[in-house]
């Protein structure tokens, strides 16, 4: 009789399903025999223009050092981040993407406590908290956004952490500064608030200064990533800023060398250069063109402050998604976020957006 390895897992893991990523281009090419060059991917909120050329130069210069382990402390990158935001290096925690930070927080909370977050929120929150043995306490959304008053009511003596994505993924809603400050003022100091700002640069630009909240709220942790606007999704590097004590706790469970050497070099170079996508508002025109095209198709979408739109098709989105895939267009169905009639569409180049809109028009007419 073979062993039941699922039974060996903790109860929270037994109830989980693996995280489903945006379908890779190579995978669709294999499945349907489509030439990769014909495939348009607007599924993972990536930067379609790629990183700054200086980043590529820095990575090439590091290739000869691949035989060496990276700096496990991430000293240079932490120093650059600290200088940029007027913090101390001991307030910075580095992660293998910002979802690594979310996982570190959940692991520190462990079994027993509960984590509060909104419906339609990033899937990493329930995955990480349940895997750690914590209870996921999901608060119903208001207009697909965070119900901050509802979150406050959900807090009890067992609440360890609140996760707030701002802007939210996959809906794109944003909590304004005044509402956020009022919320933070009312959260008990014993409860950690994780402000997940993976997409904040698309709203405030790369000069966003939300990190100054750390002075007022010692129970706040702000997480960000270089995967989105900086175009480093393939290298996986994120960071958080918090009080030194919170950072110390996270570093106790952080895996050795969790950020690889190429990612560290690229992040240092990328952080000191401006995003070519945001420069001059270069991503605004594609957003407008995509919205105009959706309006011509008489479709509705949730107003977004990220580099994506959650589009309501008014019917089951799965067949529409399948039709788009057959035409070589990859977007993201979000039925798993309790949005079965929606597709999340990343903002691409003008050509990519036009290709998506034409494919969508054809599928809707079938």
Curated annotation (Swiss-Prot):
MF (Gene Ontology): histidinol-phosphate transaminase activity; pyridoxal phosphate binding
Catalysed reactions, as listed in the record: L-histidinol phosphate + 2-oxoglutarate = 3-(imidazol-4-yl)-2-oxopropyl phosphate + L-glutamate
* Enzyme class, broadest EC rank: transferase
Q: In which pathway does it act?
A: Amino-acid biosynthesis; L-histidine biosynthesis; L-histidine from 5-phospho-alpha-D-ribose 1-diphosphate: step 7/9
Q: Which residues carry this modification: N6-(pyridoxal phosphate)lysine?
A: 228
Alphabetized SUPFAM superfamilies for the sequence: PLP-dependent transferases (SSF53383)
Gene Ontology biological-process entries: L-histidine biosynthetic process
Q: Which cofactor does it need?
A: pyridoxal 5'-phosphate
User: Do you know which InterPro entries this protein is assigned to?
Assistant: Aminotransferase_I/II_large (IPR004839), HisP_aminotrans (IPR005861), HistidinolP_aminotransfase (IPR050106), PyrdxlP-dep_Trfase (IPR015424), PyrdxlP-dep_Trfase_major (IPR015421), PyrdxlP-dep_Trfase_small (IPR015422)
Using the record, list the residue span of the signal peptide; answer none if the entry has no such feature: none
Keywords linked to the UniProt accession: Amino-acid biosynthesis, Aminotransferase, Histidine biosynthesis, Pyridoxal phosphate, Transferase
Enzyme Commission number, as recorded: 2.6.1.9
> How is the subunit organization of this protein annotated in UniProt?
Homodimer.
What is stated as this protein's family in its record?
A: Belongs to the class-II pyridoxal-phosphate-dependent aminotransferase family. Histidinol-phosphate aminotransferase subfamily.
Q: What is this protein called?
A: Histidinol-phosphate aminotransferase
Source species, please?
Stutzerimonas stutzeri
Traced from the root, the source organism's taxonomic lineage reads: Bacteria, Pseudomonadati, Pseudomonadota, Gammaproteobacteria, Pseudomonadales
Identify the coding gene.
hisC
